[in-house]
């Protein structure tokens, strides 16, 4: 496809004596036996100094190796060509669960190229603002496969891969602030022909949508936030503790599968295409961007567009009751739904209910 530049669309102690003298308040062993050190004690100190030298040399060598091998890239990237191939195999397998896109777009932004898929909705939808789907972290557009039928029955759909995350989008400039996060997404919306969009974000995609609406709301017609993290409540302590080991790519794959199953309410994920894609993203891609911080309630109160918040009653990510309460108290034009018994994988568990609630929300 041709390329438009700008926000454009294309179609990837110093001496030996000082060290041996005791410090203040330390009794010298030599002094206790008449001021003379026995040959045995001298040999012991000599051996001890030798051990210290060996340890110091090992620490220095390890530090040098770390300095040589450490990852200094300022942008998100796959760790190797083989890792990229492994992820893309899983990504393309998961994409086969999606309908065929009408168009595949690569949108040039100030921070990199963003992969966008467009899916045609019913012909009679006319000028209705389309959905723009924002996936969770370490996944990609295919995470919405279970939701596409219910959404496409209502209007056209765009789905993208988040910039700085594993997927088909390619980051080429550092994303350093939450304003940067909003800027690249705003540039994507500006490059698309529609006047406005209903942003539908899942998990970190929900935070990404709300963050855009806080910083650059011009093209945001509405927000649909499904289990958004760091938006209405902070992350749970258990989540933070469980996520530490799975953030190390060379730890066993089974640990990442167990973590992903835990977030999905115990459902097995290793045999699902989307589950394999997410695990591959966790183990092959290094992210380089600021961690999302909690959106302050006073900023939520500035949102003037309609907002639908869907919270999982059994979410392991946050306190669901507290999240629902924050949304109800601070959204000026908010509709809050809590799904009892649902896990963080709510979009795949209850796609029909989500589609029906979205249709009712947009009809009001």
Question: Where do the language-model regions lie?
Answer:
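Active-site loop/oxyanion-hole signature of alpha/beta-hydrolase fold enzymes
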Residues: 159-198
């Amino acid at each position: 496809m041709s390329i438009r530049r700008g926000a454009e669309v294309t179609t990837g102690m110093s001496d030996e004596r000082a060290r041996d003298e005791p410090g203040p308040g330390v009794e010298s062993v030599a002094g206790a036996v008449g001021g003379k050190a026995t040959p045995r004690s001298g040999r012991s100190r000599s051996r001890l100094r030798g051990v210290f030298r060996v340890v110091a040399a090992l620490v220095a060598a390890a530090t040098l190796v770390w300095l040589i091998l450490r990852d200094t890239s300022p942008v998100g990237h796959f760790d190797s060509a083989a890792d990229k191939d492994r992820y893309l195999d899983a990504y393309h397998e998961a994409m086969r669960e999606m309908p065929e896109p009408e168009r595949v777009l690569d949108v040039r932004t100030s921070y990199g190229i963003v992969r966008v898929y467009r899916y045609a909705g019913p012909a009679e939808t006319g000028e209705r603002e389309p959905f723009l789907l924002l996936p969770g972290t370490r996944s990609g557009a295919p995470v919405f496969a279970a939701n596409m039928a219910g959404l496409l029955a209502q209007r056209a759909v765009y789905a993208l891969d988040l910039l700085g995350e594993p997927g088909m989008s390619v980051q080429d400039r550092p994303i350093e602030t939450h304003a940067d996060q909003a800027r690249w997404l705003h540039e994507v919306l500006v490059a698309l022909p529609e006047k406005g969009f209903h942003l539908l974000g899942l998990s970190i995609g929900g935070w990404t949508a709300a963050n855009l609406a806080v910083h650059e709301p011009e093209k945001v017609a509405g927000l649909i936030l499904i289990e958004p993290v760091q938006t209405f409540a902070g992350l749970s302590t258990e989540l933070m503790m469980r996520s530490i080991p799975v953030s190390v790519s060379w730890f066993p794959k089974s640990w990442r599968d167990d973590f992903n199953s835990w977030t999905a309410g115990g459902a097995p994920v290793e045999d699902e295409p989307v589950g394999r894609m997410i695990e591959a993203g966790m183990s092959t891609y290094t992210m380089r961007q600021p961690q999302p911080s909690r959106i302050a309630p006073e900023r939520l109160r500035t949102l003037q567009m309609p907002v639908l918040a869907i919270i999982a009653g059994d979410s392991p990510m946050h306190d669901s009751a507290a999240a629902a309460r924050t949304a109800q108290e601070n959204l000026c034009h908010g509709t809050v739904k809590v799904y009892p018994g649902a896990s963080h994988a709510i979009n795949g568990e209850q796609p029909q209910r989500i589609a029906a609630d979205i249709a009712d929300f947009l009809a009001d």
